[in-house]
Every structure is written in C-alpha cells, then in structure tokens.
Amino acid sequence: MEEALIKRIMPNSLEAEQSVVGSMIMSKDAIVTASEMLLKEDFYHQQYGVKFETMVELYTEGHPVDLDTLQNRLKEKDVPQEIKSLDFVRTLVTSVPTSANIKYYANIVKENAIKRKLIHVTEEIENECYAGKESLESVLDKSEHDVFELLS
C-alpha cells in the first residue's frame, strides 16, 4: 500500500490564543491565571506568544498592562511591525467579551501545545524504530520516559 503524503496542520486554536491575550489586556487576574498555566512556547501563533510574554514581563516588573504600555514595550522589541500594531492589539480586546473565561481559553491553548509535543515525540520514536540502531527495550524505555515527561 502506498503511503499518501498529507499536509497536516499542527493542533492549534487561533481563537483561544486570541482570547487568552485579549483577556490578559482586560484583567490583571487573567494575567496571573494565564501565566500560571502557559508559557510563550505554548502558543502556536508567534504573535500571540510574543504578546503573552510581553504582558507577563510588564506585570512582573510592576508596570500597568494596557494598550499603550503593551504597544510601547513591543516597539522596544525586535518583532515584526504587524505584532506592534495598535490596531492589532485593539482588535484582541474587542474580540473577547469577558476575561472571566481565561482558564477555559488557556486550557485549550495548553492542550494543543501538549498535542504538538506528543506529535514530535512520536515522530522521534518512529525515526528511532526505522533507524534500527537501538534495541527494542531501549526504544520502549525512551518512549515511555518522553511521553510521561509531557505530563510534568
């Protein structure tokens, strides 16, 4: 049987990522909640990871987090112009009806990040199996370790 090459998109939710960042602009509590649940790397779309990281930095440094402080800090960073755009940041705030659902949005982002990591782990396992350089026991031990590491 011939293997078909299928272009697959890694698990992600643009809407959840937008909602996390929009909620963080609206509420300090949302910043705390999101920063306890997520890392910059959990965001599939770079622009939201950058905004997430920037708001956490501002909050940690004791600065207010609002449209102006976020845009000013983004201007200091070497990021693409569209990420620095005030219109882009404003759109995030208007697209989120309430920050009360931050845990729900953050959980979606986290679950998709774990799924992407699991895909990478299984690709490594597959490559080790095809290479045939390691014993089955060694491959199984490493596989078990790598999968359980995703849970921590």
Give a label for each model feature:
Residues 1-112:
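Noncatalytic partner-interaction/assembly domains of nucleic-acid and motor enzyme complexes
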Residues 91-152:
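Interdomain "pre-motor" coupling segment immediately N-terminal to P-loop NTPase/helicase cores
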